[in-house]
């Protein structure tokens, strides 16, 4: 009886705690969600073409990850050493299904990675290659996200006054993307620079975590960089472009959602709000940071000068397309992938029935 109870506790205990934490988290952020979704009627005041722009930018963000997946899984095959990789359809289906799972099930990126890996492996990709690819993609996209605040701080200090139209933020996203590509390339090819960044980060981290030294953090950062370089090899420039495109298209979608409301704010301040919201999305308490992102984003937008009404409606438009739209798309992608997998699977041979049967 005791071993049975022990197995049940080990199997379901962590899940029960996770569900309780999720329920508490949703209870805390429920008023914010109610306020955001309560502004639904205001969406009718937005021109239709702004919806098209935001959808196109979000699709561009997702397509960048599909491209990154194809680059990470590219390998030489055959006697002539030709390059081969997963199809666009498989890469898209795996990402959409994983992304949807990460937005529905608590666990976020971890859940998304497991589902994405499962689809890629069942599509015929070697498990070791898939594990290496997903790890490298995670390191690269996380590095790009961590780089954004570093580039945002100088822009906040020397940035121009608020523009009459936030559409200039779309131009800023392009400029930031160029700087990020250049800086990321330097990180991947210049080891002394990576080591110096690691030592500087280690000194800061040592203040709050005494067992972390400058040299240990530097060595860890160099090892992580080497894993990314080994995974993408000579395709690293394209990989940087894809990872940067994923973030900057997503940021541009937020800018477009606010521009649709005639918001007047510095694009650099909106970028900082975006960075914080993406960090909140990593909180594993609620699926995809649901509620925490809405609360943090609306609060920060108000702090940078956006009116409360515009902040709520802009957040609703952005999250409606960037968070909620991919969920049904992921379900459809998973269903389509299952049907396609079943159709491609060879029929099971049948045995002729003889008289003795």
Predicted features and spans:
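Membrane-interfacial helix-loop connectors
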Residues: 76-77, 258-283, 287-317
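Short helix-coil transition sites and intra-membrane helix breaks within transmembrane domains
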Residues: 59-74, 102-114, 282-293
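Short alpha-helical transmembrane interface motifs in multi-pass membrane proteins
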Residues: 22-23, 50-54, 97-102, 210, ...
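Membrane-embedded helical hairpins/re-entrant loop segments and their flanking transmembrane helices
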Residues: 64-97, 258-273
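Hydrophobic/aromatic residues in alpha-helical transmembrane segments
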Residues: 25, 35, 64-72, 116, ...
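A short amphipathic helical element positioned immediately N-terminal to and/or at the very start
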Residues: 37-45, 120, 220-232
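Transmembrane helix-loop-helix hairpins in multi-pass inner-membrane proteins
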Residues: 1-40, 98-211, 290-357
């Amino acid at each position: 009886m005791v071993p049975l109870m022990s197995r049940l506790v080990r199997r379901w205990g962590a899940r029960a705690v996770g569900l309780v934490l999720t329920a508490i988290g949703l209870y805390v952020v429920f008023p914010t969600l109610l306020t955001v979704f309560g502004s639904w009627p205001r969406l009718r005041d937005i021109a239709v073409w702004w919806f098209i722009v935001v959808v196109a930018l979000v699709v561009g963000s997702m397509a960048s990850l599909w491209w990154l997946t194809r680059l990470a899984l590219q390998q030489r095959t055959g006697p002539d050493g030709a390059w081969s990789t997963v199809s666009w359809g498989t890469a898209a289906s795996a990402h959409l299904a994983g992304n949807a799972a990460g937005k529905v099930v608590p666990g976020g990126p971890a859940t998304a990675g497991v589902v994405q890996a499962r689809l890629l492996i069942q599509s015929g990709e070697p498990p070791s290659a898939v594990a290496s690819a997903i790890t490298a993609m995670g390191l690269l996209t996380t590095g790009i996200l961590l780089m954004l605040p570093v580039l945002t701080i100088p822009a906040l200090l020397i940035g121009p006054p608020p523009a009459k139209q936030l559409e200039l933020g779309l131009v800023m996203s392009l400029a930031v993307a160029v700087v990020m590509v250049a800086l990321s390339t330097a990180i991947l090819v210049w080891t002394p620079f990576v080591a110096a960044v690691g030592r500087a980060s280690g000194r800061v981290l040592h203040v709050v975590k005494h067992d972390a030294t400058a040299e240990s953090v530097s060595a860890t950062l160099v090892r992580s960089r080497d894993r990314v370089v080994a995974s993408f090899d000579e395709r690293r420039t394209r990989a940087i472009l894809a990872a940067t495109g994923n973030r900057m298209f997503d940021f541009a979608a937020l800018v477009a959602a606010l521009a649709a409301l005639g918001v007047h704010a510095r694009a650099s301040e909106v970028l900082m709000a975006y960075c914080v919201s993406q960090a909140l999305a990593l909180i594993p308490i609620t699926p995809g940071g649901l509620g925490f992102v809405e609360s943090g984003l609306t609060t920060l937008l108000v702090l940078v000068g956006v009116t409360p009404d515009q902040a709520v409606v802009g957040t609703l438009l952005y999250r409606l397309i960037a968070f909620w739209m991919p969920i049904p798309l992921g379900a459809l992608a998973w269903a389509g992938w299952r049907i396609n997998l079943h159709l491609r699977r060879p029929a099971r041979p049948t045995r002729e029935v003889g008289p003795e049967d």
